[in-house]
Amino acid sequence: MLIRERQRDRVRQALDDVGLADLAPTEIVGEQSVATQQLIEVARALASDAKMILFDEPTSSLPQRDVQRLFEIIERLKQRGLGLVYISHFLEEVRRVADVYSVLRDGRHVDSGRIDDVTDPEIVSKMVGRNAVSYTHLTLPTNDQ
């Protein structure tokens, strides 16, 4: 019986960690929103004491408010020292959550490095598969100046 109680406690803690403390563990996952289903998957990994979590295009079907919530949870997981693999075609998302990047094209490793280097046009070209243009944002003077 003690083992079951520990398991329940871990499930409750995991649901709390992803902001779903009010969700009953017996609720049917398929009846939840897509965002809640994704958070349940993260909680499931946490409850099983995973050392690494894979996020594969996690924002592709989420409304913006849920995207922000997911990023907050990812940041907390990073602070706890969990290993995270974040797969996305959205460069800004990758830059927001990653410390390092790896580029795959057609199943092959093309490049990897520090996320701060992702502004380099050569690296961006490898990511998008075509030449990238670097530009500097200029502020033009108005008639008042």
Show where each model-derived region lies.
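Glycine-rich phosphate-binding loops of nucleotide-dependent enzymes
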Residues: 1-138
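A short, hydrophobic C-terminal helix/tail in secreted or cell-surface proteins
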Residues: 139-145
